């Protein structure tokens, strides 16, 4: 089983970018992997974790906490490491970090077309909630990394 550790090494960067491109196939500029990494590191919250199989990044999870709710983002497991508990370990690790900060509820979003992952999250205690998710891009903050 890969070990879960905070992202802290620029050596991880290229592997995380490749992983996210493989798993998510980014199309929108605001989701550019390098930009996402830079913005998360700038937040300095210590909520960016990688699963390492030796020196190889096998998975990632980013978490966020606003003082009330926590969020999970970019839960990704390389296809060669799936069905081995890596995703579960990453989510549980992020949950523990959020819980230690006083988080009362954790949310996540599933992109349309990836509904199959719903069962995975339900197996971890998450439930589909009747919500409408809305977003607004801030173009001046979307710059290439």
Model-derived regions: residue spans:
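A conserved beta-turn-beta hairpin within the catalytic core of GNAT-like acetyltransferases
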Residues: 64-73, 82, 128-129
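Active-site rim helix/loop that mediates acceptor-substrate recognition in acyltransferases
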Residues: 27-50
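Conserved GNAT acetyl-CoA-binding A-motif
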Residues: 98-110
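Conserved beta-strand in the GNAT
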Residues: 50, 56-64, 71-76
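A short beta-loop-alpha structural element at the N-terminal edge
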Residues: 2-16
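Conserved beta-strand-loop-alpha-helix junction that forms the acyl-donor binding cleft
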Residues: 108-117, 135-139
């Amino acid at each position: 089983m890969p070990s879960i550790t905070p992202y802290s090494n620029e050596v991880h960067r290229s592997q995380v970018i490749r992983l996210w491109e493989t798993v998510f196939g980014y199309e929108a500029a605001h989701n550019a992997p390098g930009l996402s990494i830079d913005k998360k590191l700038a937040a300095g919250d210590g909520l960016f974790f990688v699963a390492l199989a030796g020196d190889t990044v096998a998975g990632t999870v980013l978490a966020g906490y606003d003082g009330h709710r926590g969020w999970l983002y970019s839960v990704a497991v390389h296809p060669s490491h799936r069905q081995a508990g890596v995703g579960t370990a990453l989510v549980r690790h992020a949950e523990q970090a959020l819980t230690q900060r006083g988080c009362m509820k954790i949310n996540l979003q599933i992109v349309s077309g990836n509904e199959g992952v719903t069962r995975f999250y339900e197996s971890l205690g998450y439930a589909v909630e009747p919500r409408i998710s809305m977003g607004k891009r801030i173009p001046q903050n979307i710059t290439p990394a």
